[in-house]
Amino acid sequence: MSDDIFLVTGGAGYIGSHTVIELINHGIKVVIADNLSNSSYDAVARIEFIVKQHVSHFIKVDIRNEKELNQVFSNHKISGVIHFAALKAVGESTKIPLEYYDNNVSGTIALLNVCKSNNVKTIVFSSSATVYGDVTRFGDNSMIPIPEHCPME
């Protein structure tokens, strides 16, 4: 078993909670950070039921709050981050784009600042295929997989 401790942001969300289960099942120590705006503490209870052990480190925190996030890093000696924390509803994002920008972009920047100040150099960033747009609009498979020269919409 490794002494590394991974922070999973958005760890109470769907993908985050499944990732936490796999990490725990592989003997990796995990700290879950989630502001519960898109999820529920019930997910942590389900994780505990599945892995048959108590999840000792769940922290309700907004990743935009660098002071609180720094405290998480120093209290738990975080060695790597798997970053899932984000607002994700595409339709809603077109109605309130600044809130999405603040949460998703500013939150990621704050997280990266905290990683840097704590000398954490391992981060896995997750996003959505929707950021690439619809490449099927070209009417053939010339843009699948998406090449770097693919035109932006």
UniProtKB/Swiss-Prot annotation:
Gene3D superfamilies: NAD(P)-binding Rossmann-like Domain
UniProt keyword terms in alphabetical order: Carbohydrate metabolism, Galactose metabolism, Isomerase, Multifunctional enzyme, NAD
Domain of life from the UniProt record: Eukaryota
EC number(s) from the headed UniProt entry: 5.1.3.2, 5.1.3.3
Enzyme superclass (EC): isomerase
Keyword Membrane included in the entry's annotation: no
GO biological process assignments: galactose metabolic process
Required co-factors: NAD(+)
InterPro entries according to UniProt: Epimerase_deHydtase, NAD(P)-bd_dom_sf
Functional pathway: Carbohydrate metabolism; galactose metabolism; Carbohydrate metabolism; hexose metabolism
Region (Galactowaldenase): 1-153
This protein's GO CC annotations: cytosol
Molecular function (Gene Ontology), one example: aldose 1-epimerase activity
Catalytic activity reported: UDP-alpha-D-glucose = UDP-alpha-D-galactose; alpha-D-glucose = beta-D-glucose
Keyword Isomerase in annotation: yes
Function: Mutarotase converts alpha-aldose to the beta-anomer. It is active on D-glucose, L-arabinose, D-xylose, D-galactose, maltose and lactose.
Family designation: In the N-terminal section; belongs to the NAD(P)-dependent epimerase/dehydratase family. In the C-terminal section; belongs to the aldose epimerase family.
Name the record gives this protein: Bifunctional protein GAL10
Organism (species): Candida maltosa (Yeast)
